[in-house]
A protein has these predicted regions:
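Alpha-helical repeat scaffolds in large eukaryotic proteins
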Residues: 26-29, 48, 98-102, 137
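Compact alpha-helical subdomains of small soluble proteins
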Residues: 48-60, 65-73, 116-185
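Short acidic, low-complexity intrinsically disordered linear motifs used
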Residues: 87-101
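Terminal, compositionally biased segments
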Residues: 1-4, 85-89, 183-185
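N-terminal leader regions
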Residues: 1-42
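Short runs of predominantly hydrophobic/aromatic residues within well-ordered alpha helices
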Residues: 40, 90-94, 132-135, 166
Length: 185
């Protein structure tokens, strides 16, 4: 299912800037190796401008801790999840849940075209960042959930849950919040 344009992650832009971001991270590593603080600061500014995100030195240290350069570059390239102009429809929510749950699900075939890596690697590298950096924050920002409800653990914590079960958990939490609001009004 195609989501509304305002919901979809701008994967085309991410793919376009990905090589530049990857190159800048490599240049940052080289500048760190020769302890060129001025060059490091300049590269951080370039990354922030290119991605439209506030990137810090700490953000760049992540790939040294195990995420890897490709994963970090893709995280930087992903657009920020928007605050939607109208609430998510149940079908849209279910589509997003499917995308989070099923790594073989391919909502963005254009991502895999012309990439210099095997398709399976790309899916693996990009599926988790897409969930963590885009889909989870999108849901957290746009669903009317109780403050005590953590979508990542309360809805998606059971790895064996089917997408329809996760949808039911989220809808139940949203209904509970609505019911509680009505009782206090």
């Amino acid at each position: 299912m195609k989501l509304r344009n305002e919901i979809e992650c701008n994967i085309i832009k991410a793919k376009q800037i990905y090589p530049q971001v990857l190159d800048l991270i490599d240049k940052y590593d080289n500048a760190c190796n020769i302890e060129d603080k001025e060059k490091c600061t300049e590269i951080i500014q370039q990354l922030s401008i290119l991605t439209g995100k506030h990137i810090t030195e700490n953000d760049l240290f992540e790939h040294w801790e195990g995420d890897g350069t490709e994963d970090l570059a893709f995280r930087f390239c992903l657009s920020k999840p928007p605050t939607l102009s109208s609430p998510l429809l149940e079908q849209e929510l279910f589509e997003i849940i499917q995308r989070i749950c099923e790594p073989k699900y391919e909502p963005y075939p254009e991502l895999y075209e012309d990439m210099p890596y095997p398709k399976e690697w790309i899916k693996e590298w990009f599926w988790i960042p897409l969930n963590c950096v885009y889909y989870f924050p999108l849901l957290e920002k746009n669903l009317n959930l109780p403050k005590s409800f953590n979508i990542r653990t309360d809805a998606f914590g059971d790895n064996d849950a089917a997408p329809i079960e996760i949808l039911e958990i989220i809808l139940k939490a949203m209904k509970l919040k609505t019911d509680n609001k009505q009782q206090t009004a």
